[in-house]
């Protein structure tokens, strides 16, 4: 049942997710592609987590945050991808009212945690390059745990603002969501109640988090760049740059896409463009992160080779 009679109006008890396409051939092709991407995402990020756990050479703050970033990537992708895959296989993909709220909240939670972790990693690089003598004090285990806990608290608060706003909306008419998951913007369009406050609160919290984390990342890298340019040693410059390139690549991919969705005016792009960009940052980027860090980071590659050699000769 998608509708429930309640007094003088009909309340929506579930939603129909329209997905990415109605073309049956394209649905099969997309199912295979996205399933492969999801399997690579889970296996790649799990491998990153396990490698960091078992390699003593990687027991540093940067890799501590990277392991939790990998966990967030798995959660982020898993919040929408399994349901998207089901959508390709069934003629009409329905999701309950409660399930929609849970999916929205989990996607926002893991996405927000990723924002904070990327900012924490930028701060870590700033301390390592600009204040190397104070690194052990400023990035102690206690500080790392505090930054991690702060990331999860920030994720919880932002997710709460979205889910509470969603549950405050009243749906009494159309229940067809023009998306492949329960994104907040298309849900607001279906509401038959006043959306002025419920729509503003999540936008404010999400926008504030994006601005604050981008500010931390930008300031960190400005100081890093200034410090690198002051270095007299070419080898020192190259080493400093190499420790930042993988993180900068991940930041550019993630923030570039979420800025398109949440910062640019809605009139500047269509719903179909929104869907494509959403697939990129919710499905593709979580797959790319472990590849970026493993291919561009010498310590990760070195630890991987040592573990492979150990397993081969053991």
Swiss-Prot record:
Answer yes or no on keyword Membrane: yes
InterPro entries recorded: GPCR_Rhodpsn (IPR000276), GPCR_Rhodpsn_7TM (IPR017452), Olfact_rcpt (IPR000725)
Cysteines paired by S-S bonds = 100-192
Tell me where it resides.
Cell membrane
Q: Which residues lie on this side of the membrane: Cytoplasmic?
A: 50-57, 124-136, 221-240, 296-314
GO terms under cellular component: membrane; plasma membrane
Listed transmembrane segments: 29-49, 58-78, 103-123, 137-157, 200-220, 241-261, 275-295
Write the record's keywords in alphabetical order, separated by commas.
Answer: Cell membrane, Disulfide bond, G-protein coupled receptor, Glycoprotein, Membrane, Olfaction, Receptor, Sensory transduction, Transducer, Transmembrane, Transmembrane helix
Q: What membrane topology is annotated for this entry? A: Multi-pass membrane protein
Instruction: Write out the GO biological process terms.
Output: G protein-coupled receptor signaling pathway; sensory perception of smell
Q: Which SUPFAM superfamilies match?
A: Family A G protein-coupled receptor-like (SSF81321)
Q: Which domain of life is it from?
A: Eukaryota
Please classify the protein's predominant subcellular localization into one broad category. membrane
- MF GO annotations: G protein-coupled receptor activity; olfactory receptor activity
Provide the membrane-side ranges marked Extracellular in the record.
Answer: 1-28, 79-102, 158-199, 262-274
Has keyword Disulfide bond? yes
Q: Enumerate the glycosylated residues.
A: 8
| PANTHER family given in the database record | OLFACTORY RECEPTOR
Explain the purpose of this protein: Potential odorant receptor.
The family annotation for this protein states: Belongs to the G-protein coupled receptor 1 family.
Full protein name: Olfactory receptor 5P76
């Amino acid at each position: 049942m998608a509708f429930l009679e309640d007094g003088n109006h009909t309340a929506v008890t579930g939603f129909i997710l329209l997905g990415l396409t109605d073309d049956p051939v394209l649905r099969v092709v997309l199912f295979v592609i996205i399933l492969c991407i999801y399997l690579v995402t889970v296996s790649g990020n799990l491998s990153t987590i396990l490698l960091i756990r078992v390699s003593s050479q990687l027991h540093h703050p940067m890799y501590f945050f990277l392991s939790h970033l990998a966990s967030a990537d798995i959660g982020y992708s898993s919040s929408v991808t399994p349901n998207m895959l089901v959508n390709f296989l069934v003629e009409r993909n329905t999701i309950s009212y409660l399930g929609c709220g849970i999916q929205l909240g989990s996607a926002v939670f893991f996405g927000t945690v990723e924002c904070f972790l990327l900012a924490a990693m930028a701060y870590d690089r700033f301390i390592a390059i600009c204040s190397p003598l104070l690194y052990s004090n400023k990035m102690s285990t206690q500080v790392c745990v505090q930054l991690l806990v702060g990331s999860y608290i920030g994720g919880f608060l932002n997710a709460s603002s979205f889910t509470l706003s969603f549950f405050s909306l009243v749906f009494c008419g159309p229940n067809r969501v023009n998306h492949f998951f329960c994104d907040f913007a298309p849900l607001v369009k279906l509401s038959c109640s006043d959306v002025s406050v419920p729509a503003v609160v999540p936008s404010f919290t999400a926008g504030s988090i994006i601005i604050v984390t981008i500010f931390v990342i930008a300031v960190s890298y400005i100081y890093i760049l200034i410090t690198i340019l002051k270095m007299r040693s070419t080898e020192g410059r190259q080493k400093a740059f190499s420790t930042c390139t993988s993180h900068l690549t991940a930041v550019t991919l993630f923030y570039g896409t979420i800025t398109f969705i949440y910062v640019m005016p809605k009139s500047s792009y269509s719903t179909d463009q929104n869907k494509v960009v959403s697939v990129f940052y919710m499905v593709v980027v979580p797959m790319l992160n472990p590849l970026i860090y493993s291919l561009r980071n010498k310590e990760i590659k070195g630890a991987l080779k040592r573990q492979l050699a150990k397993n081969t000769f053991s």
